[in-house]
């Protein structure tokens, strides 16, 4: 019995080490993808771009993002674009842009869905952000 317990403890330690290595690898994948995404200036960024830069499959990227960030790469990219719209709206001077222009600039084509997602993310409509300066 003691030999069995000792063997199980060693196996448990091996499993923990393997899980730690997996989590470290996932962290590197997410960091690589995130650094790349943050460095890209435009809206034309796709999950396949993140896969290429991280040198992993879509499935591996999906698992890594869900494990490390708690969301999918698609959701991450959408939120990144929402934040970039918000930055543009906050930086705008009176009359220099519109919500529609900025939404289109960042690849949002369905304005109702865009407004809903924006409000869910920031607690206000994009038009309110444009009117209000921090």
Task: Locate each region found by the language model.
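Alpha-helical bundle regulatory/interaction domains
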Residues: 1-42, 46-58, 67-72, 87-112, ...
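DNA-recognition helix of C2H2 zinc fingers
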Residues: 115
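Generic hydrophobic, amphipathic alpha-helix propensity
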Residues: 26-30, 77-82
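A short His-aromatic
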Residues: 64
């Amino acid at each position: 019995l003691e030999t069995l317990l000792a063997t199980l403890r060693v196996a448990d330690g091996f499993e923990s080490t393997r899980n730690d290595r997996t989590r470290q690898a996932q962290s590197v994948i997410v960091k690589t993808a995130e650094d790349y995404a943050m460095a890209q200036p435009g809206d034309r960024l796709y999950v396949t771009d993140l896969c290429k830069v991280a040198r992993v499959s879509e499935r591996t990227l999906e698992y890594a993002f869900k494990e490390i960030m708690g969301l999918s790469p698609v959701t991450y990219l959408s939120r990144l674009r929402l934040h970039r719209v918000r930055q543009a709206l906050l930086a705008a001077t009176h009359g220099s842009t519109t919500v529609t222009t900025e939404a289109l600039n960042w690849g949002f084509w369905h304005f109702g869905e865009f407004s809903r997602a924006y409000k869910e993310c920031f607690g206000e409509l994009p038009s309110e952000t444009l009117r209000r300066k921090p």
